[in-house]
């Protein structure tokens, strides 16, 4: 089966060949023909299965027959994912003079307004920033959205959660009604909210909603090539254990993503590990967009060996060469654990995931093990003796210096000010706390 066999335009098949993408994946083989036949579509497949091309290929095929703007709107929950999707659209349509605009927070608002007024062929946006333009940028800016032929919700399970509700509705209000556009939902996890959309009465004059789920997360939770282990530590020496894990013989040269639950933790670890001579980048919502983009590029290019991230990076981002995932903090939702460790052991490669477990994490670990139907193994190569001997002193000094720097710089204040300015100070999205001064 080739992309030509699925109905993809010849020029696009050639672009895919040039990118060394020769054979459609399961999600692409199922969804591309259905979308080309006019079906609304719900596609579920794990991260790294080619979901972006599953919706991009049919959209670009039909766009090339009638290349107006704005032809397609793709909404995504994170800025990084929006930039990544835009890169793929630009690469696929490079020979066709495709025009793509990215509308996300952290970038120049006026420049985005001008880009929307030029009516690009495709707009990739986060709901919050696009809603801001709809409210504030005038009819000339948003008029192109009223002609959109395709609406895509990527990582639909997150977009359909309550936190995006009002912004999404504001975006939907300026789009053509559902009978005059195709709506495509793609996600790694088909939740009840997503599945319920399939059960709605069909739109008159349109074919029924097509839904295809490839190896749901329940069935392929953990690849057989992924080694899952843990260390059990007192919370006050977690950082020292992290340092020791990164120095283990089997991990000392590995590319690694360290997941944390809070932006403050991400920043503490970034500064601390740099002081300990690790090549580190970080990705969290407290960083300006330019720094986030630069961090991702540094990590992809190998300039940074370690990426420290909140869960903003655990979905969808194309980081194909990760060899080690460390859960410095344990997520409350077992599915978030699955998405995190899904950054490694891809395409049959081996990978490791190590969780640093504290005394308060036992219930979460039990829920995770029940969800993945697998017990974690104790990582015996690191223990109290070698941590105390090799890591504790240097790590404690580096952590203390990092906390003092952050306190001096009022880390976290910018976000509080911005949220108050926009009337959002009573809303609790991603938790940001000002670091406490170290008692050591």
UniProtKB/Swiss-Prot annotation:
CDD domains: DEADc_DDX49, SF2_C_DEAD
Domain Helicase ATP-binding per the UniProt entry, residue ranges: 32-208
GO molecular function (one): ATP hydrolysis activity
UniProt domain Helicase C-terminal: residue ranges: 247-387
Catalysed reactions, semicolon-separated: ATP + H2O = ADP + phosphate + H(+)
Q motif (motif): residue ranges: 1-29
Enzyme category, top tier: hydrolase
Motif segment (DEAD box): 154-157
UniProt-listed Enzyme Commission number(s): 3.6.4.13
Binding site for ATP: 45-52
Keywords: ATP-binding, Helicase, Hydrolase, Nucleotide-binding, Nucleus, Ribosome biogenesis, RNA-binding, rRNA processing
The family this protein is said to belong to: Belongs to the DEAD box helicase family. DDX49/DBP8 subfamily.
Protein name: ATP-dependent RNA helicase DBP8
Species of provenance: Candida albicans (strain SC5314 / ATCC MYA-2876)
Gene from which the chain derives: DBP8
